[in-house]
Amino acid sequence: MAAPVERLAGVCAELEQWLGEESGQRNDWAEGEGIVWRLSELFREAQYRELAEPRIFRLILQILSRVSCEIKVATLPAGAFTDTHCQLPAECFRCLRNACVQCASNQDSVRNVGLIEESVRLIQIFGAPHVLQEPALVAFRCGLQFLGNTAAGNRDSQNAVWACAFPDLFLSCLVHDDEKVVTYSSMVLFTCINREKVSTLQDPSKLDVALSVVTAYSKYPDAEWMYLIVMDHFLLCPDLVKAVYLSQSSPERVTLLELILGKISQKEPLSAEESEALQAIAAFLSDCFQTQCKTILKLTSPSACDEEEPIVVTRLLDILCEVTSKNEHLSCLQTCPGLLEAAVDILRLTHLAGKQSMNVFTAAHTMSMGQDLTHAAVGFKAHLIRLIGNLCYQNKENQEKVYQLDGIALILDNCSIDDNNPFLNQWAVFAIRNLTENNDKNQELIASMERQGLADSSLLKSMGLQAEERDGKLLLKSVKKSPAL
């Protein structure tokens, strides 16, 4: 068996000969494809990758340039490529993909001979929206994989790929119908992006790339690369998050907010940079909640149950509850202008709406945990009370605000069991505890309240029980069933 150096030199000589002969035209591309395939197989092994010289990559550049020229002069319907148009460049991309695996010298050679620029031009041809042929799609995918491998761990190559692919190639790939194209392009984007590049996405002319990442993630929620792009890069740039949110539709906002909630809820400790960025994002989302919170009242109408905007409001509230439950983030929202007032106000409005007519905000006593736990209104009042309690934790100023807004009586009026608001009673007790801690004024207010009889006991009756008050105490008694007639 020939030594690795000789085998590689032999395949390279074959390729050089093929390119120099008349048979190197389109009708004989199958021969060239076979030679490149053998080279691809060799590059699967590290020893051959390490022996590769720049002239090999110059030969592959010649092939790709020849393919590009052939496609340009071919008199074919738009997007209609022959198999030979696609199979040879696909094999070239596989060869380059293999050559760049954990091999910085090959990454440098690929970049230096101009293969990145030529490859991106050809990839864009195969990735045009009207191109639907499977062979072209395969070449498209292989080209993206090559770009990812040539950029991996190589800053200069990352910058070269970014210069050629941003924003047009990324935009066309992220909205592509093929899931693999979306996945591979997001891998390339993640590999190339850094803090400086993230900041450029805020430019209105470039923002569509960031928007497309979130939209693609909503379509493919198991796509790890898009998840990492948002978590590791977008969420470190509050200005970008703000620009993305303000440009999104309600369903897209829900996706972004769920990603933010996931970041806040993660168990791993945050870095100082992550913590600072999330606090800035939370302050922005606090303003959004105050602006949008009253749209939740649309849900009082049965016809509005499919509205997306109220779902956005519930996700905003989820985030605010989670942020204020962590001591390191609490103070940034305790001082947010208008947030506490908005929470008390919308609690009052939803509570009143539930009393005025039968709707999703009416307390339900069914012993079945509500009819639809996925409804946007489920848990909304409980989470409002949770937020109010968090904002008042060891904060005298906010305790006083709730007192002035008559919020204590409002919270106490929400202490009954409500299947539409799991743990409502517990969150109300928690909020009252935080409102009265080291606050004599609020304690005296509660102490001065008069007993007004028993609350609605329909739930007890449905269980065959009734409550009686005797000597200042409550007693539970079973209800005797009336004899059947």
From Swiss-Prot:
Pfam families: Atx10homo_assoc. Keywords: Cell cycle, Cell division, Cytoplasm. Gene3D superfamilies: Leucine-rich Repeat Variant (1.25.10.10). GO terms for biological process: cell division; regulation of cytokinesis. The keyword Cell division applies. Its main location: cytoplasm. It is found in: Cytoplasm, Perinuclear region; Midbody. One of its GO terms (cellular component) is centriole. May play a role in the regulation of cytokinesis. May play a role in signaling by stimulating protein glycosylation. Induces neuritogenesis by activating the Ras-MAP kinase pathway and is necessary for the survival of cerebellar neurons. Does not appear to play a major role in ciliogenesis. Belongs to the ataxin-10 family. This is Ataxin-10. The lineage of its organism: Eukaryota, Metazoa, Chordata, Craniata, Vertebrata.
